[in-house]
Amino acid sequence: MSSNNSGLSAAGEIDESLYSRQLYVLGKEAMLKMQTSNVLILGLKGLGVEIAKNVVLAGVKSMTVFDPEPVQLADLSTQFFLTEKDIGQKRGDVTRAKLAELNAYVPVNVLDSLDDVTQLSQFQVVVATDTVSLEDKVKINEFCHSSGIRFISSETRGLFGNTFVDLGDEFTVLDPTGEEPRTGMVSDIEPDGTVTMLDDNRHGLEDGNFVRFSEVEGLDKLNDGTLFKVEVLGPFAFRIGSVKEYGEYKKGGIFTEVKVPRKISFKSLKQQLSNPEFVFSDFAKFDRAAQLHLGFQALHQFAVRHNGELPRTMNDEDANELIKLVTDLSVQQPEVLGEGVDVNEDLIKELSYQARGDIPGVVAFFGGLVAQEVLKACSGKFTPLKQFMYFDSLESLPDPKNFPRNEKTTQPVNSRYDNQIAVFGLDFQKKIANSKVFLVGSGAIGCEMLKNWALLGLGSGSDGYIVVTDNDSIEKSNLNRQFLFRPKDVGKNKSEVAAEAVCAMNPDLKGKINAKIDKVGPETEEIFNDSFWESLDFVTNALDNVDARTYVDRRCVFYRKPLLESGTLGTKGNTQVIIPRLTESYSSSRDPPEKSIPLCTLRSFPNKIDHTIAWAKSLFQGYFTDSAENVNMYLTQPNFVEQTLKQSGDVKGVLESISDSLSSKPHNFEDCIKWARLEFEKKFNHDIKQLLFNFPKDAKTSNGEPFWSGAKRAPTPLEFDIYNNDHFHFVVAGASLRAYNYGIKSDDSNSKPNVDEYKSVIDHMIIPEFTPNANLKIQVNDDDPDPNANAANGSDEIDQLVSSLPDPSTLAGFKLEPVDFEKDDDTNHHIEFITACSNCRAQNYFIETADRQKTKFIAGRIIPAIATTTSLVTGLVNLELYKLIDNKTDIEQYKNGFVNLALPFFGFSEPIASPKGEYNNKKYDKIWDRFDIKGDIKLSDLIEHFEKDEGLEITMLSYGVSLLYASFFPPKKLKERLNLPITQLVKLVTKKDIPAHVSTMILEICADDKEGEDVEVPFITIHL
């Protein structure tokens, strides 16, 4: 066995800077289990290498590959690590080095022979792909099943594919879904065990879940850690069984879901062939799984009869033979189709026609799916697929009227695209090559998209091209899933490196891919102008935020360009296809906004760790960013105070922060330590004592109910303890960040901070005693008026603050350095401070603390990500891409997809049709239609045109936020405007010139129809 010598992470350690986004998908326990797993992949055509790529990126102990067959030109259709120079060499040997580059922690080996099946004992998971015969798969599976080795099989043929999973007689699933354990506050527990949620909060539980309780008063025995099985009664209540013998419920209580491991049993491949268990990939094709189950078996039988050759492309003789084989199998395996179900000859014929094809989108779909099943097999995380799944995308085939498929048009032409030509035909391949496309973003989805496009040959023709843009640069945390990038690329521009990488994959793209580093938005409309958008065939988003997606979507609607949209969140992924005049747009439906945390909860009444983390991040922002920026503005902007006094925000807080920052400037690092220690006392001791002074622990509401009940947890002040890890790190990180603000050298070697050095400074400090403020009011509910709202300008307190500020002229040249929050730098103290600060506040309120990783996830608003989902989702997008190139107009041919690989779940639906409107008996598309006006028309002529040609009386006309015309304008204003061309009118009203790059303008109108009724109508596009 040959191998590479790669660096291994130490046992029990995970490189969080590399795996950070994946850790939030799998968790540390699963990652550590993966690091003890050796994986073998048999077959390194497109499917095998896609699986291997995703598994190596994920980080297993080792990867071994086996494929001694020589590289052929047609392999380049889907095997992205092969080049024409590799033709004739062994696929395994050539691919190993490329796989090894993906992850320095995963050694990649080549298995030299498969003659002795017992050598498989060294592996925990074996994956057999489409180069392995069914007979050999059965033999290998029998050995694996009896030896406790997890076995997975998969193969793709044209637009068809399947996978099979056998994880043995007894496999333990540790976490079926991967979702965060649900938790909630209880308002009541009845004797029969009915648990009711507090404040109409949904519990989110399902029948059969298990929960444990804490902080229940009255039913104290519930708090002993016992697990209770849940029976759901509704969204706000569930039952746990009788609790009569436990006593009587008084108040309080928190439930927490507990994931209980469960065992699953799998059957062998031999058993499953005749009596399969299916996971359905598309419920609209419910009946196809059984047909394809027989069809794929028949393909293997055909190959045995024909010296390993699969049916010839579009050959009816071979197709009829395959149908006969399937018919015979249906008799031998009657359980598969079931009684009275005939063989679907059209489906089997299509399988025969495409058997020699290899399509990047299908390969990417199964490559992501199977790789995730490998990770499940290694870790026990998520629910395995049980046991067969079949998939097809026959809707992707082009219209035979436009692109006829026959033996002649699908024959190989000695091209790297031959396996794609076998499915779609040569003419369609030419149309793919001559497409003009725009990819927005080259991160995880963008890299996968470009890889697939390189394999497709998209944009490689004489009339085709690809434009990709991304204004981001490569970071180490990207390398775990953005596979076109290597460690040497860190710091470089994503789009440029990605473009260079795919040109190396497919030299046909050289000179055909234009990499830009410009953000797509209103500020770059001079770059991405009218002529740019109008030249495109379609657009693909590879973005990670809603605002950018929405902007691109609006551009595509305006220019009537198809848009392929997709996104991932951990193991979840979605795809959406947007077609002009056919479907709704991305912006037509929006996710509900995130539920914000009430300010009163943050300020005074937190009850879970999310609240304390949000509070700590806000404190970080105030201490180290806002204060420094306010000081700098005060010192450089002469009218800063005057402008601040006019604002409705926290004027007093702004002025206090400036005063404190300038009057208490530290002179050395010891001063920074003292500042941090005093802030600890203020935030975690004095402020809590003040809160309890206002609302003692025995306080009652106006209704006579205990004030500290329900979601309000009575806090306790903290006494500083330098040997408490959170207390100490609040001071360490706080002092270091304050030193950064003031340009003071901190005690910031990367070594562990010395407790004794900090202690010697703190021991000599005088910590002020707490004195309650009887005049301080604390807001209890967000709906209540803020009792400490800003005093009016000119009040004594504000005047004193203003007069206390030093004259900026006495501080000429002085400047503070604001801290710019960066979550992924473990040496900058940012997450260290927020973690310590949040945990100290959690200790105040008896909330379970969180480690650095969880704090970073919440404070940094990190999106969990893993290469497997990205690969699968991109595959689905590329199957829709063929339909765009074919200009399909039947909405039923398109598919929007939602997947969750953790369950696993696959859902496909037709896109929602665009909404239609009507005026004066004229129907129009509310999204895609508009009134097109050519030339810089006069306002009066525009009004007349609508009256004569559309039967509409324009009552208002606007450009952006500027009102150009209204029927109620005074006669003088109307006279002034009616004779102006639109461009001059816009200039007059906005007092701005029309930019030179603008050749189209959008005008919004309000209009009355012939009956004088106000009607909704499309916008106007003026083509200059």
UniProtKB/Swiss-Prot annotation:
Statement: the UniProt record of this protein carries the keyword Ubl conjugation: yes
Molecular function GO terms recorded: ATP binding; ubiquitin activating enzyme activity
Binding locations of ATP: 21, 444, 470, 478, 481-482, 494, 520, 545
Domain of life: Eukaryota
Annotated compartments: Cytoplasm; Nucleus
Catalytic residues as annotated in Swiss-Prot or TrEMBL: 600
Chain positions of cross-link Glycyl lysine isopeptide (Lys-Gly) (interchain with G-Cter in ubiquitin): 595, 608
Record GO biological process: DNA damage response; protein ubiquitination; ubiquitin-dependent protein catabolic process
EC number: 6.2.1.45
Outcome after substituting residue 912 to P: Strongly reduces formation of the thioester intermediate with ubiquitin
Region (2 approximate repeats): 27-579
Similarity-based family: Belongs to the ubiquitin-activating E1 family.
Complex formation: Monomer. Binds two ubiquitin chains simultaneously. Component of the RSP5-UBA1-UBC5 ubiquitin ligase complex composed of E3 RSP5, E1 UBA1 and E2 UBC5. Interacts with the E2 ubiquitin-conjugating enzyme UBC4.
Protein name as catalogued: Ubiquitin-activating enzyme E1 1
Source species of the chain: Saccharomyces cerevisiae (strain ATCC 204508 / S288c)
